[in-house]
Amino acid sequence: MASSMSKAFFADLKPIADHTLIAASSIYKELPADWVVVLTDVKNSTEAIEAGRYKDVNMVGVACIVAVQNALAGHSFPFVFGGDGATLALPADVIDHAKAALTHTRAVARRELGLELRVAIIAAADIVKAGARLAVAKLKISEIQDIALLHGDGWALADSWMKEREAQFSLPDEPAVAGGRAGDLGGLECRWNPLPARKFEVLALIVQARHGGETAAQVYRKILSQLLGPEYRPISLTELRLSWPPKYLIQEARMRCERGARRLGYLMKTYLISLGHVLFLQWRGQKNITEPIEYLRELTQNTDYLKFDGALRMVVDVSRLQKERLLKTLEDLYHTGEIFYGHHADPCALLTCYIQGPHKHIHFVDAGGGGYAMAAKALKAQKRAC
């Protein structure tokens, strides 16, 4: 059982505001040994991407976070969205609630979207015993929202164990618990259609330094120096537009509601709400009301376009010239043996949301057409080539 101090580990971390420090090992604290690492990913996601279903893959990845967050209401824990899955860390004494929530999510993904979700549960102590490091920090991304940062080679080791030692660490495929907090995907929303790039393309990028310590931190700072600033954020007020009908609302309803009258009622209600939002925004534009709607302003800031989980992950809006310069920098760093990297470009960004309240919401962004999943595939190909 986790101690009371251990359980408050993540809640007690003070967030950093300087985004250039996300790779500095000094900002991180070791994950308590009595915690558990939870990893999820969608099996055979490449097939879904080729079928034009990457948004479904994204939705399942976010649903894992939403399900556990709802099941553990009141608990603060780190999580990182990875496109086709998620990484979480939890106190050991709440893991049964998380298992029930993820069992339900896996069953819903299979039944409603035809996607198979892999779930691994690994004790942090086992990862540390293998000689790897698990560390966590917090990054302030807005006045009201922090996100987790993960550091150390233990996260990548856990990911490899999830796939190579699936029989040992996989969550048993048991019948899902019906109803209750374990089956709560409330707050999972997909009301935004794909958001076109403002400049040229939306780029999903994963960069992994090949060396540790200050050398790695300097490499990451060099890359970040080209990509930090409002102009690179993939979501902005000027481009944020609701269109009707929402393209992915049916998938949202299928994930959140049982079949039958409840799902039909949810769809009708949400279609009407989204239509009202569209009409209001159109009226606002005609009346030349320039005051930004508070929620939309918060949305642009509460987006996880920058992440670190042992590798730098970003989704950025770039011009053709910015893309060329960035890729040249990355290619130079790759050929000098300093990094591995993968990227995927698409005309649009995808947004999947977790709404807990008027000022409590986070928005998970990815590039369309495969985004992080295709970037990860390219990075792995680089590693194999070495």
What do the PLM-derived regions correspond to, one by one?
Residues M1-C386:
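Regulatory and interdomain segments flanking nucleotide-handling catalytic cores
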